[in-house]
Amino acid sequence: MKKIVLKLYVLLLVAGIVACSNDDNTVDNSQNSELRTVLEQTGLFYDITENPDTSIIKRKAELNYKEQYSMFYKQDTNHDDVGGDEFMQRVGILFRGFDRPTVLVTEGYNWRGFLDIKDLATNLNANMVCVEHRNYGMSYNQDKGKWEYQTVAQASADLHAVYQALKPIFKGKWMCAGTSKSGETSICYAYYYPQDMQLAAAFCSPFAISLDDERFGPYLMEEVGTEESRSLMKAVIRRALENGENGYYKDVCRLMKSDGKEEPTFTKYVFNLFDLLFQVYQYMPSDEERIVKMTTMQDDKDAMLKYLCDIIVDNDEEDLYSYWVECAKELGLQNDGYAYFADLLEGTSFDKDMVIPSLLKAEDSWLVESYDSTVFTDILNNFMMTTPCPLMLYYVHNDPWTAAMPPKLGPNAKLIMNPVGKHHSALNDPALCSPAIRQEVMDYVQKYIY
């Protein structure tokens, strides 16, 4: 009841402020202190801090924003048990105007600043509200270590609560958006709360439906890049798998042990080897860059060992570990094409069914048995076809995650395929997104947001 009363108060308070704001895309800097005042008046936000993203302070005029803040919002650990355990969730706000559109950036990981979806928000001259995912960054809850409530349903309820708290303040239209797992989070939010947003957008977001999703292997080995770069990629993998557990793997274990790190199982080594090449395509926009990197790995043993040691997953890295937990519970995991190298894996201890367990701590190995694909299967087979909330799904051809794009969409969802670029939501860089693709994205978004 307290939250409802405060929200009504804020609605009345903001009404007067918004009446003085502009109808065009320009920012009226006379309102510079108003947002903090309104946020403090709600009593819903804690530890409000100015200018959390120092990287954009000098670009304030260029980015055309008034203020930026970080703060914390009190959430229920279990939204089905209101009044039980609570945790503080970090929220970032880039403010451009009370009557401007608002982009709710549905962070799938920890919040590092106003980075994801910044081009889209800038082009819209929209506010950005970034919500850090539960059990990432500074938003850990009492469920940590039990993981019972680390689900897409609970994360969607987090977003719904933040939206309800801020909607009386930001009066323009709202959309949610994110890249990669953050985009998955947007679609899941629209799935659970289809009436909240005018549009949900996902950039480069995969929708895996098993712990061994085999759609990825053929796409990575046969579709991305050029034949030359794919041949180099396969040669690098073959070299790293030569002699099985007595080859590069043995050297990697020796080096990691000498550095005081835990030696990986052979299964974990194989997963990370494939993931290394996966990332080469994911983040390098040009085939020339990929060829240079893979040639270096192939020709320089020391460089190869360094690459391999650097990418072995550390189970003690908190934020990444939360991701593996979510994969084990609902998100699923890619199979990057182990069958293409069966001749080198035969007779080794590699077991594709042990990939997820190798990424989890021993005390959490039970999570694999809890895997449930119900939500994502329903999203792909039903929600994408019948969604009442308009959707936009943006993919890049050479991004391996595109392998897990939705197989079909209904009339209220739009697919945009970028033939160039990388695993990113960049719209304003011509090297990553052509003017035609950029315009297609903006035309579709503006149809719902203006």
Locations of the language-model features?
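Conserved alpha/beta-hydrolase
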Residues: 121-141
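Alpha/beta-hydrolase
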Residues: 179, 188-329
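C-terminal motif of bacterial Sec signal peptides marking the signal peptidase cleavage site
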Residues: 16-19
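Catalytic-loop region of hydrolases
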Residues: 22-124, 434-435, 440-450
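Alpha/beta-hydrolase active-site loop
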Residues: 148-169
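C-terminal subdomain of alpha/beta-hydrolase-fold enzymes, centered on the catalytic histidine
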Residues: 278, 282-450
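Alpha/beta-hydrolase fold nucleophile elbow
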Residues: 170-180
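Bacterial N-terminal signal peptides that target proteins for export
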Residues: 1-9
